């Protein structure tokens, strides 16, 4: 322990803002006679005196990096959505806070009464992503003189939501966009949707297969769907040959090759020679020979490979595509009827806006560089081998759907750092009860403060706290005295300009349900307040969810941060303005998160809102609103029977009321009230209700769905809506 101030001249005046009690013989201290000492952190001091604008928030949260071209901050300090990307006109931008208010306001105020958490989908962004992907490949094909075309395939595992898949088929029908399935239910889904799509769109059948899966894929072929059965295992070939002959269907076969090329990040584990999927070169040769012996070598038409999701650089991409193109050319040489090369997934998303090649959260390229690299690598190998250029496919699901949905949730409360205030008498009494070592720490803390040795103050404060904790464990200090120690240590940290403690913001969310990849693989997503961005965030915090699990928190953020800049909550939670609410948004989570979410603590999925750009006063129309699963829904998912549970509880309530000493009329009212309360609990979502006036069961009168045909969006809200109180346009069936 540093020998500081064991004997200090009492005449030495303390620094501004300090006065510590030495012992009971000294006069009572003054608390903050002249304010706290100036912070030694000049950067913080400078920042706190500057004007804050939406541009500052945009830079602070890197919104222009990860959000471009779909998300920005408007002049009101709200997140603004550009549904058509760079082609969005100023009057077409959608204020996300207004969408949230439309969703959550009570129905009698023109809202939909939906409960949080809430996923907001923007099909216009989905359309723009598809068109952008097709456009960059079309440009690469044309500019490089490539003699075939590109046609994409959407892997439905990324997001199997009905409207998402149907939108992709509809938006992509003009350029032969197809679907990929990896299981029997996904195959059924894809078959049904592609009946309304392009007849040239591919139906790629991946995943492990049994006889039923293969039979179903061949049925799809009979239904004139452009179906390709991709061999993941060598053993699947025998089933394909046998069943296709029995069904008298000539199959189109693909095979997945295990490449030597792989990347070292988390998502590269499915690639390389030891990857989970695909055939080795030895197995490929055997497959070719068996097909030739069966007179079906012409059926082999597609080569599939997958370097891994989130390919970090175009150099690695070119290496992998070049290797696959060599295999493709060898299959042509061996007599296969090759037509397609399927690059699989890998087109990455820049989650943190850094355009870095060294992180799973970013990639060092854009759409155009990706497309140009793929086309160039295939063309180079095929030209050298004098092989006809194949149709290029990719399964870029993450790149297609990540941007189109935003998860919105509320911060309902936060931990406070308010210290216990002690009078001079209480402080003297506290010091007298300390043991000798703790009292020495307190005196040394006082001396260090008087000398202005602020770093040493922190050291002695920590030692004092630890010794007092030990005294408390031994029963020598009571809980009020331990709280006083915490108060003194907090006082020291604040007074000397030490960094403010990180607060915990409690959010109305389940990490396990809505952000499972953060819990499972530390995947980071940009999280930002969707409003108040014209105000300076004054605290830093981590996010803690509703589950009874220590893993139910988000304490890592993009940019390598362990906390997030946040705004102060009001005394009752929320953000003070905007009706006292404080809303946060998680962006770029449109791929995988909904499909992977579980039911930990029986918290179900979020409410869902589908929003399209329109010519209405607020620039949007709600085309579909679905309340999240109720308590009854999640109980039913775990094999409980909510109806029987309700009857059991209602019977118990009836017994309770019957045995109560009330008038018969009052008993009837009491029973009705209890039964109604129980029914409401089953019908409500499992999450917190932060506004008792809102309608929690938005589906009560309409079976759970608000919807309209997309054609009806055109012209919706054409009526005058100048007044802010006027109902925002939406369609309700």
Curated annotation (Swiss-Prot):
Its GO biological process annotations read: alkaloid metabolic process; arginine catabolic process; nicotine biosynthetic process; spermidine biosynthetic process
- So what does this thing catalyse? L-arginine + H(+) = agmatine + CO2
Q: List the active-site residues.
A: 548
User: Which locations, inside or outside the cell, does it occupy?
Assistant: Plastid, Chloroplast
Q: Which SUPFAM superfamilies does the record match to this protein?
A: PLP-binding barrel (SSF51419)
- Residues that, per the record, bind pyridoxal 5'-phosphate: 309, 346, 395-398, 592
| Record-listed substrate binding positions | 460-461, 549
Transit peptide, from-to: 1-44
Phenotype caused by lack of the gene: Reduced alkaloids and nicotin levels associated with a lower putrescine production. Occasionally, an early senescence and a lower viability of the older leaves is observed.
Pathway of action: Alkaloid biosynthesis; nicotine biosynthesis; Amine and polyamine biosynthesis; agmatine biosynthesis; agmatine from L-arginine: step 1/1
Supply the EC number(s).
4.1.1.19
One Pfam entry name? Orn_Arg_deC_N
Q: InterPro entries, per this entry?
A: Ala_racemase/Decarboxylase_C, Arg_decrbxlase, De-COase2_CS, De-COase2_N, De-COase2_pyr-phos_BS, Orn/DAP/Arg_de-COase, PLP-binding_barrel
**GO MF term set:** arginine decarboxylase activity
Q: Which cofactor does it need?
A: Mg(2+); pyridoxal 5'-phosphate
> Which UniProt keyword terms apply here?
Alkaloid metabolism, Chloroplast, Decarboxylase, Lyase, Magnesium, Plastid, Pyridoxal phosphate, Spermidine biosynthesis, Transit peptide
Name the predominant localization: plastid
Top-rank EC class of the record's enzyme = lyase
| Positions carrying N6-(pyridoxal phosphate)lysine | 157
Q: Which NCBIfam families match?
A: PRK05354.1, speA
Q: Into which family does the record put it? A: Belongs to the Orn/Lys/Arg decarboxylase class-II family. SpeA subfamily.
Role: Involved in the biosynthesis of pyridine alkaloid natural products, leading mainly to the production of anabasine, anatabine, nicotine and nornicotine, effective deterrents against herbivores with antiparasitic and pesticide properties (neurotoxins); nornicotine serves as the precursor in the synthesis of the carcinogen compound N'-nitrosonornicotine (NNN). Required for the biosynthesis of putrescine. Catalyzes the first step of polyamine (PA) biosynthesis to produce putrescine from arginine.
Subunit and interaction comment: Interacts, via its C-terminal internal region, with the tobacco mosaic virus (TMV) replicase helicase region.
PANTHER family to which the protein is assigned, alphabetical: ARGININE DECARBOXYLASE, ARGININE DECARBOXYLASE 1, CHLOROPLASTIC-RELATED
Q: What is this protein called?
A: Arginine decarboxylase 1A, chloroplastic
Q: Tell me the organism.
A: Nicotiana tabacum (Common tobacco)
């Amino acid at each position: 322990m540093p020998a500081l101030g064991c004997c200090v001249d009492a005449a030495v005046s303390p620094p501004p803002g300090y006065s510590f009690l030495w012992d009971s013989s000294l006069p009572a201290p003054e608390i903050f006679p002249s304010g706290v000492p100036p912070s030694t952190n000049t950067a913080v001091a400078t920042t706190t005196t500057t004007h804050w604008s939406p541009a500052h928030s945009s830079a602070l949260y890197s919104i222009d990096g990860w959000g471009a071209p779909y998300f920005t901050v408007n002049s009101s300090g709200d997140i603004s959505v550009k549904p058509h990307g760079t082609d969005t006109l100023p009057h077409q931008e959608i204020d996300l806070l207004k969408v949230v208010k439309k969703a959550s306001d009570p129905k009698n105020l023109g809202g939909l009464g939906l409960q949080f958490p809430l996923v907001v989908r923007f099909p216009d962004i989905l359309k723009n992503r598809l068109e952008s992907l097709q456009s960059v490949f079309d440009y690469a094909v044309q500019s490089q003189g490539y003699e075939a075309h590109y046609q994409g395939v959407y892997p439905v595992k990324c997001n199997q939501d009905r409207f998402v898949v149907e939108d992709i088929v509809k938006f992509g029908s003009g350029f032969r966009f197809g679907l990929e399935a990896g299981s029997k239910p996904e195959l059924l889904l894809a078959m049904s949707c592609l009946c309304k799509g392009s007849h040239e769109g591919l139906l790629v059948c991946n995943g492990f297969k049994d006889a039923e899966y293969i039979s179903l894929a061949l049925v799809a072929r009979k239904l004139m769907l452009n179906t390709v059965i991709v061999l993941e295992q060598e053993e699947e070939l025998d089933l394909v040959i046998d069943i296709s002959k029995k069904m008298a269907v000539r199959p189109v076969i693909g095979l997945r090759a295990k490449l030597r090329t792989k990347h070292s990040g988390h998502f590269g584990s499915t690639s390389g020679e030891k990857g989970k999927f695909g055939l080795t070169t030895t197995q490929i040769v055997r497959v070719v020979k068996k097909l030739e012996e069966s007179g079906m070598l012409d059926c082999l038409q597609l080569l599939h490979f997958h370097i891994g999701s989130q390919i970090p650089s175009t150099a690695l991409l070119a290496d992998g595509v070049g290797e696959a193109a060599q295999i493709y050319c060898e299959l042509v040489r061996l007599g296969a009827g090759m037509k397609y090369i399927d690059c699989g997934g890998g087109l990455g998303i820049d989650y943190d806006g850094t355009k870095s090649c060294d992180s799973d959260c970013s990639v060092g390229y854009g759409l155009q560089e990706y497309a140009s690299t793929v086309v160039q690598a295939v063309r180079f190998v095929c030209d050298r081998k004098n092989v006809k250029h194949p149709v290029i496919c990719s399964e870029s699901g993450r790149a297609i759907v990540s941007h189109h949905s935003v998860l919105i949730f509320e911060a309902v409360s936060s931990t406070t750092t308010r210290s216990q205030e002690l009078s001079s008498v209480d402080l003297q009494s506290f010091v007298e009860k300390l043991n000798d070592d703790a009292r020495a720490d307190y005196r040394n803390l006082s001396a260090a403060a008087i000398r202005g040795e602020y770093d040493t103050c922190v050291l002695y404060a920590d030692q004092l706290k630890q010794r007092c904790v030990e005294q408390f464990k031994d029963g020598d200090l009571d809980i009020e005295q331990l709280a006083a120690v915490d108060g003194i240590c907090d006082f020291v940290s604040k007074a000397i300009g030490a960094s403010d403690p990180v607060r915990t913001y409690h959010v109305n969310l389940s990490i396990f349900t809505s952000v499972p990849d953060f819990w499972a693989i530390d995947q980071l997503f940009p999280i930002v307040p969707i409003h108040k961005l014209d105000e300076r965030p004054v605290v830093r915090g981590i996010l803690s969810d509703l589950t009874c699990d220590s893993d139910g928190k988000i304490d890592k953020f993009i940019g390598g941060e362990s906390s997030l800049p946040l705004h102060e909550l009001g005394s009752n939670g929320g953000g003070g303005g905007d009706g006292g609410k404080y809303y946060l948004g998680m962006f770029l989570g449109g791929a995988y998160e909904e499909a992977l979410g579980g039911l930990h603590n029986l918290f179900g999925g979020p409410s869902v809102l589908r929003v399209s750009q329109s010519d209405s006063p607020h620039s949007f129309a709600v085309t579909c609103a679905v309340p999240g699963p109720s308590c009854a829904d999640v109980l039913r998912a775990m094999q409980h029977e909510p109806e029987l549970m309700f009857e059991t509880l209602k019977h118990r309530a009836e017994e309770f009321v019957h045995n109560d000493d009330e008038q018969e009329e009052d008993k009837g009212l009491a029973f009705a009230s209890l039964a109604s309360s129980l029914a409401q609990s089953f019908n409500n979502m499992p999450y917190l209700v932060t506004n008792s006036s809102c309608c929690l069961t938005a589906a009560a009168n309409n079976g759970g769905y608000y919807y309209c045909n997309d054609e009806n969006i055109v012209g919706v809200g054409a009526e005058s809506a100048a007044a802010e109180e006027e109902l925002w346009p939406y369609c309700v069936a």
